[in-house]
Amino acid sequence: EGPNIGLISYLASYAKINEYGFVEAPYRKVKKTYDEKGRLIDQVVTDEVEYMTADVEDEYVVAQANEPLDETKHFKRARVSARRRDDILEIDAEKVDYMDVSPRMMVSVATACIPFLENDDCNRALMGSNMQRQAVPLMVTQQPIVATGMEYKAATDSGTAVLAKNDGIVEKVDADHVEVRNAQGAVDNYSLVKFARSNAGTCINQRPIVEVGENVKAGQVLADGPAMRNGEISLGKNALIG
């Protein structure tokens, strides 16, 4: 997209930076059991997650995240879709070492908010993910009818929402404050930001979404921030026809 392509990059979902500054991604480990003669007798996909850099991952066969598993977490098919280095191949299940944790791990959080991304033209997806950053927060927000499941996590991790510190019961709510009595009997007081100016010149306004007497859990959204509705990221309006 223009001369600045490649200058601004975003981490893929689930990726993180290790102590040496390299990008690491998580993979589910495939546990293999051999008999005394070295023959494979069992292979199960575990919930144990291992982070690897790209050069380490190159040495292993990695199955796709949407490869079907049975109830005991064994591969359903004898041959599975996997990759090794730059090759996408169909390979015997017994040769698989790891499995992707999610189909969306290759895209950023913004791209993962695009519904039916796999049916989208790649240029449109590129423009759409970039343009989400340019959205101006609306005065009256509307959560998306068609969503991908990333909206709540993106909103709560944005830092603009007010989250409950502890479990408790809401005792007082007004436009400026929320008070929650926690399990220890102490009162947690939350002050809301009202009509403040952001660095981009947009309006930061937090609105409470809980009611007096409501039970809340630690980490639950107490007040929406800008471009949020009911704890979900809400950048635009639903285009309704008819």
Which residue stretches match the model-derived regions?
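Acidic, glycine-anchored pre-beta loop/turn
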Residues: R207-V216
